[in-house]
A protein has these predicted regions:
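Outer-membrane beta-barrel architecture
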Residues: 32-40, 131-133, 145, 199-205, ...
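Outer-membrane beta-barrel channels and translocator barrels
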Residues: 34, 141, 153, 213-217, ...
């Protein structure tokens, strides 16, 4: 049985090789009046065209969560309380000769608005980038070729847009009465530091080209191409200021879980060890190219092209408690549209 399987496997590998050897389309020999292989190397400039999309934010605090408040500064309560919902209680809190309300007086809170929301006016945009690109072509005929293109993976700066606020709402129930809560808690400024993050981009592509004109006759030969691009991103580095802000937000969420909602309002550290992680999704996308070559002689040519590829890519920033592995919250997502302009010169 093993011998038979080996024979079948050998046949599958060898027979196609033998059959392609005599094909006019699959050969290592030059074609009739044209070269079978060509290579070019040069400048590659990528210009992302997509606009920033509002980021979605989620936390582990479900709608209607009831949590003990614990100790809390009076100023934090007054800043979050809706005065018109209970003017008498609001006035009484103002008159209390205390800077900090003890847990026996702060009571409990019912929390809404933190489970999931969209941060309006925010987003992430990739900056323009330059790198060295290489294009390899296999010519089936003088007009049809398969091109594989890639470049040295560049570092791409991701610019942030807007501020993220957490839309806290709910109510506080104290021994003195109840009062509504409503406060937009500032989480982070995505524009701080000039860039929100940096990422290394791998963007190989394969295209089928049709080239007009004829080798040896027309020096200038335009071409069109369609194919597929694969986008892979790694080595993601988040802005340190944004990372610190998200760690603080993680402490806020954990304080609510710990029955210390007042500490969350006061921005105190919690029992958690928040860590920020960034993940991006890989994606395939169609790509279209318009370009031209100019032959200087039999072996040297110049080529220039413009490619367009629309891709939808997601980036997720999560905050996890390193002590328990529990996710406290996450920020997602960014969608990018990529447009590449390519100029290259190399021996064919």
């Amino acid at each position: 049985m093993k011998k038979s399987l080996l024979g079948i496997a050998t046949s599958l590998i060898v027979l196609p090789t033998l059959s392609y050897a005599d094909s006019p389309y699959f050969s290592f020999k030059d074609g009739d009046g044209f070269k079978r292989f060509s290579a070019s190397i040069g400048w590659l400039h990528a210009m992302p065209q997509g606009k920033a999309n509002n980021v979605n934010v989620n936390t582990s605090i479900a709608e209607g969560t009831t949590a003990k408040v614990g100790e809390v500064s009076k100023d934090a309560v007054l800043n979050a309380a809706v005065k018109d919902s209970n003017p008498l209680l609001y006035g009484a809190l103002q008159l209390l000769p205390l800077e900090t309300l003890p847990s026996g007086l702060s009571g409990t809170s019912t929390i809404n608005g933190l489970s999931n929301w969209q941060a309006d006016g925010t987003g992430l945009e990739a900056d323009d980038v330059d790198t060295v690109g290489m294009m390899l072509n296999y010519h089936f005929t003088d007009h049809v070729s398969l091109e594989v293109k890639a470049g040295i993976p560049p570092k791409v700066d991701i610019k942030g847009k807007g501020d993220i606020y957490a839309p806290l709402s709910g109510s506080a129930d104290t021994p003195l009465g109840s009062i509504d809560l409503k406060k937009d808690i500032h989480i982070t400024d995505l524009t701080q530091g000039g860039k929100a993050a940096s990422v290394r981009a791998w963007l190989p592509a394969a295209e089928l080209h049709y080239q007009f004109g004829k080798s040896g006759v027309n020096k200038f030969r335009p071409y069109v191409g369609v194919g597929v691009m694969y986008a892979y991103f790694n080595d993601v580095k988040l802005n340190s200021g944004i990372e610190s802000d998200l760690v603080a937000a993680g402490h806020m969420i954990q304080n609510i879980h710990d029955g210390q909602a007042g500490a969350a309002l006061d921005g105190k550290t919690s029992s958690a060890d928040p860590r920020v992680k960034v993940k991006t999704t890989d994606t395939f996308a169609p790509i279209a190219t318009l370009g031209a070559t100019y032959d200087f002689n039999e072996n040297w040519f110049a080529a220039g092209s413009v490619s367009y590829s629309k891709m939808n890519n997601e980036a997720k920033i999560s905050v996890t408690d390193n002590n328990t592995g529990k996710e406290l919250g996450g920020v997602l997502k960014s969608m990018l549209t990529l447009n590449e302009a390519i100029i290259d010169v190399k021996e064919s």
